[in-house]
Amino acid sequence: MAQLAKFDVPEELTNKALEALELARDTGKIKKGTNEATKAIERGNAKLVLIAEDIEPAEIVAHIGPLSEEKKAPYIYIKNQKDLGAASGLGVSCATVAIVDAGKAAEMIQDIAQKLDALK
């Protein structure tokens, strides 16, 4: 079983990331699902990547963190896939979401990215 190479994220920061996702969903553009998020990261379009921690098997999202590092895309772990699905406007769980157009969440995402850099 693969382990996610993750770092601890304060709950306050994960809540802010989910809030930014909701704002970007309404005023910008997001890519939902691991495949769509992977493509956005590879193309250099991802402004912020949100990854659910509770995905089984972990191999589904194991490549997202290293790929985001390589492409210099900020990424954050969200504890629950249901929360991630709800924030992205889906009625179901979601493993990964990439924000490609921040819309009105641009400043919020920039602030989150700076705080994430300090954590790593």
Swiss-Prot record:
The record's principal subcellular location, in a coarse class, is: cytoplasm
Q: Does the keyword Kinase apply?
A: no
User: What GO terms describe the biological role, i.e. biological process, of this protein?
Assistant: ribosome biogenesis; translation; tRNA 5'-leader removal
Keywords from the UniProt entry: Cytoplasm, Ribonucleoprotein, Ribosomal protein, RNA-binding, rRNA-binding, tRNA processing
GO CC, alphabetical? cytoplasm; ribonucleoprotein complex; ribosome
Q: Which SUPFAM superfamilies match?
A: L30e-like (SSF55315)
Q: Which GO terms describe its molecular function?
A: ribonuclease P activity; rRNA binding; structural constituent of ribosome
Which PROSITE patterns does the annotation name? RIBOSOMAL_L7AE
User: For this UniProt entry, which segments traverse the membrane?
Assistant: none
Q: Where found, per UniProt?
A: Cytoplasm
Q: How does it assemble?
A: Part of the 50S ribosomal subunit. Probably part of the RNase P complex.
Family under the similarity heading: Belongs to the eukaryotic ribosomal protein eL8 family.
Query: What is this protein called in UniProt?
Result: Large ribosomal subunit protein eL8
Question: What's the encoding gene here?
Answer: rpl7ae
